């Protein structure tokens, strides 16, 4: 396109210098408004579960199976079968998951968007998704891209002779890139220096190299990799050194050593890598490619640019002599040869079998045979002593290996979906797995008539409003919208490790739980017909009762909606190691920070709020309400800007915004003193999290709404709505929970238990 004779136009919408250019440390409140209805093209009433359940899954599987061998001239299938390509596609969709914060994974179909669609580790997966488009087009919104990517991998394995463990749908698409996922600080493709230069908070947690401390919550060795470089750490083709990184990154995605070996060896039973020529033949990634590429990228100028001339990783390895059929070829070759270092046609380090005959088929020329080859990370399974023992056991026991791979693959592709209650479809396995955070099925009923007497008993128990509300918050606020883990259901707050977390003040928590357990026991022992209440429900009900009491003290009659149906998990149903990652390093809602961090406390509050799926107004209402209710960790009264604590007022906002108060930092601390501007008398103390609601322009604007003369009634409604949202975040049994609100316009009276929760 010629620019000759054109007028300059440099002020396109969104262009120019942005606020973030001027103020790089600007608080990322935008993270609380992503994936809203404004970006969703589907109708407001669209119900994905209903759409998926109407899908003819058998017909879809048949169409996918037919695609596997329907090689297209524009992107020919290796060995005449797309199965290995689709296995890689599914693996890389799910494999971004990291258990540190639950982000990444396959659950939102993010492989379609930047940065994932343009990562160097995802070269050629643009073609895989484009091959799928006719099938996605045929079935429309009955299956999301997120579900289709994983189902295609499942079908690919099946068509290559492998029996999978099962498949569950239920992943709803998003329609824009995630903005909340921290992939690292590096600014170059495949950079890895900054993530290993963060100090003590980055220590290896999974038996990795103590000299390579990977920053949390990252689970990849380099920027834009799923895991670690297959050529070895920092280009060093050392299988033993590579094993350190493998153990670290797979551990961070919740895989143990056996699962790690099963996934690597099982995945490498199929297909090949691609490094037919030098990398400088490969063009720009999809996000940078020209419009004429129509969303594809990495245009290859080497030879035909496809088929035998494909360049992906730069490595040219085929692991098995049956690359489209499940078998033991990977282990047979791994242990059947000695290996010597060589280079691929692209110049990358890889390994070739010594004194071997050509037994490996050529991907596009049936008349040719190739020498067995391996990656540095493949040899880690032989030369790391722990991995070697597992690998030899698998090699000697093919059925054990097949079962281990099936289970590990299912875990890989479903780990970020949360509990089984979210699973859809006829292929959901019946076996309950510990990593699914199982909760017993509901075995009791509770009626509306039971609720009011229980509240009276709770309020007469001697527990304070702060104790009731704090315990309910501690139970429910473990929920993570990223991988749908945590929450109040299961009452795991009474179990290890949650009962011992510092943020939960174990001694105080034990006192509250003892009282609630007594109330539970007395109630259950006197009820006929199997009627009872779980501790999980009672904790939430008690929190609501505390809020009602606090509102009453402020002159408001409020009914906090309550939906029973939670159950109590056992310690045996709780993997303490897996749950340990849910321990908050900071909870700004309780003014808690576990230690010193490079990230300011207010940014950690935003991170917590985003994991709780809160909007900025919901976060603001909750912080203001919890402060005046004296919901704090520890004995400090930071942020309790009220003379009547445990009363639900707007005092937090009015006193924070009061210009009669002058704030000054306390030397050496992240806390502040608020003194009377005229007399110098100390009035309040607060943290960075408290003061940000008066300092940040957006949060101040929200605070002003509640601090206004007509703001109290709205604050009460908004606080109750946000509270009930958090209490019910893990209630996947409640219908149609896509977006919802609480109608608090007519609060007096005791409604049906869940009638006040309206879904939209």
Curated annotation (Swiss-Prot):
Q: Where is the active site?
A: 92
Q: Which keywords, in A-to-Z order, does the entry hold?
A: Heme, Hydrogen peroxide, Iron, Metal-binding, Oxidoreductase, Peroxidase
Alphabetically, which GO biological process terms does the record hold? cellular response to hydrogen peroxide; hydrogen peroxide catabolic process
Q: Please outline how this chain is modified post-translation.
A: Formation of the three residue Trp-Tyr-Met cross-link is important for the catalase, but not the peroxidase activity of the enzyme.
Residue positions binding heme b: 268
Cofactor names: heme b
What GO MF annotations does this protein's record show?
catalase activity; heme binding; metal ion binding
Enzyme group, top EC level?
oxidoreductase
Reaction(s) the record says it catalyses:
H2O2 + AH2 = A + 2 H2O; 2 H2O2 = O2 + 2 H2O
Gene3D superfamilies in UniProt: 1.10.520.10, Peroxidase, domain 2 (1.10.420.10)
Record PROSITE patterns: PEROXIDASE_1 (PS00435), PEROXIDASE_2 (PS00436), PEROXIDASE_4 (PS50873)
Any Pfam family matching the protein: peroxidase
Cross-linked residues, Tryptophyl-tyrosyl-methioninium (Trp-Tyr) (with M-253): 91-227
Q: Which PANTHER family match?
A: CATALASE-PEROXIDASE, HYDROPEROXIDASE I, BIFUNCTIONAL CATALASE-PEROXIDASE
Q: What does this protein do?
A: Bifunctional enzyme with both catalase and broad-spectrum peroxidase activity. Required for maintaining the normal activity of the TCA cycle.
HAMAP family linked to this entry: Catal_peroxid
Identify this protein by name: Catalase-peroxidase
Organism of origin: Burkholderia cepacia (Pseudomonas cepacia)
């Amino acid at each position: 396109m010629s620019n000759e004779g054109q007028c300059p136009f440099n002020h396109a919408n969104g262009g120019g210098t942005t606020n973030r250019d001027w103020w790089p440390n600007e608080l990322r409140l935008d993270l609380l408004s992503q994936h809203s209805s404004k970006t969703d093209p589907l109708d407001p009433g669209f119900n994905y579960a209903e759409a998926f359940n109407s899908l003819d899954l058998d017909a879809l599987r048949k169409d996918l199976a037919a695609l596997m061998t329907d090689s297209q001239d524009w992107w020919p299938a290796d060995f005449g079968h797309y199965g290995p390509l689709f296995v890689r596609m599914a693996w890389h969709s799910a494999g971004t998951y990291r258990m540190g914060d639950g982000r990444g994974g396959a659950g939102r179909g993010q492989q379609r968007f930047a940065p994932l669609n343009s990562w160097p580790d995802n070269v050629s997966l643009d073609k895989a998704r484009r091959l799928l488009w006719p099938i996605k087009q045929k079935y429309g919104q009955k299956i999301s891209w997120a579900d289709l990517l994983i189902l295609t991998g499942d079908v690919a394995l099946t068509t290559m002779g492998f029996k999978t463990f099962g498949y569950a749908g239920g992943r709803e698409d998003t329609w824009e890139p995630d903005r909340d996922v921290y992939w690292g600080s590096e600014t170059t493709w495949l950079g890895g220096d900054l993530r290993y230069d963060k100090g003590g908070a980055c220590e290896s947690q999974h038996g990795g190299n103590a000299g390579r401390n990977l920053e949390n919550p990252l689970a990849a060795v380099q920027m834009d990799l799923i895991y670690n470089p297959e050529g070895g750490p920092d280009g060093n083709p050392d299988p033993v050194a590579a094993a350190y990184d493998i153990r670290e990154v797979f551990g961070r995605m919740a895989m143990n050593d056996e699962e790690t070996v099963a996934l690597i060896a099982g995945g490498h039973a199929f297909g090949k890598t691609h490094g037919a020529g030098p990398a400088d033949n490969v063009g720009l990634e999809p996000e940078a490619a020209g419009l004429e590429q129509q969303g594809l990228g990495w245009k290859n100028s080497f030879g035909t640019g496809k088929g035998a001339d494909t360049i992906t990783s730069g490595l040219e390895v085929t692991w098995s002599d049956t690359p489209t059929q499940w078998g033991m070829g990977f282990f047979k070759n791994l242990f059947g040869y000695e290996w010597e270092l060589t280079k691929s046609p692209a110049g990358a380090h890889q390994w070739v079998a010594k004194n071997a005959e050509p037994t490996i088929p050529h991907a596009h020329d049936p008349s040719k045979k190739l020498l067995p080859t391996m990656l540095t990370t493949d040899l880690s399974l032989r030369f790391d002593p722990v991995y070697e023992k597992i690998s030899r056991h698998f090699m000697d026991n093919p059925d054990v290996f097949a079962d281990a791979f099936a289970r590990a693959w299912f875990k890989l592709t479903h780990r970020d979906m949360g509990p089984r209650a979210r699973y859809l479809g006829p292929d959901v396995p019946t076996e309950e797995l510990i990593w699914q955070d199982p909760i017993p099925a509901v075995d009791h009923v509770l009626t509306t008539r039971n609720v009011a007497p229980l509240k009276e008993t709770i309020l007469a128990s001697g527990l304070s409003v702060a104790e009731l509300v704090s315990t309910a918050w501690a139970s429910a606020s473990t929920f993570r919208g990223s991988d749908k883990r945590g929450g109040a259901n299961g009452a795991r707050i009474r179990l290890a490790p949650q009962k011992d977390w510092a943020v939960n003040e174990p001694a105080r928590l034990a006192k509250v739980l003892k009282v609630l357990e007594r109330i539970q026991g007395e109630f259950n022992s006197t009820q006929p017909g199997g009627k009872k209440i779980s501790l999980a429900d009672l904790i939430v009900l008690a929190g609501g009762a505390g809020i009602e009491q606090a509102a009453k003290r402020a002159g408001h009659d409020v009914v906090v909606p309550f939906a029973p149906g939670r159950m109590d998990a056992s310690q045996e149903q709780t993997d303490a190691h897996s749950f340990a990652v849910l321990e908050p390093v900071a909870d700004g809602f309780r003014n808690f920070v576990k230690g010193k961090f490079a990230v300011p406390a207010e940014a950690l509050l935003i991170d917590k709020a985003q994991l709780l799926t809160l909007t900025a107004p919901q976060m603001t209402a909750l912080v203001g309400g919890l402060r005046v209710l004296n919901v704090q960790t520890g004995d400090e009264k930071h942020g309790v800007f009220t003379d009547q604590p445990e009363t639900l007022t707007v005092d937090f906002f009015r006193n924070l915004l009061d210009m009669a108060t002058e704030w000054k930092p306390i030397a050496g601390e992240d806390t502040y003193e608020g003194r009377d501007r005229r007399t110098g008398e100390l009035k309040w103390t607060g943290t960075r999290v408290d003061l940000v609601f008066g300092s940040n322009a957006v949060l101040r604007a929200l605070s002003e709404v509640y601090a206004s003369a007509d703001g109290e009634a709205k604050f009460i409604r908004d606080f109750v709505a946000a509270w009930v949202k958090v209490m019910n975040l893990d209630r996947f049994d409640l219908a149609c929970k896509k977006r919802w609100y609480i109608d608090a316009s007519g609060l007096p009276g005791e409604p049906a238990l869940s009638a006040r929760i309206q879904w939209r």
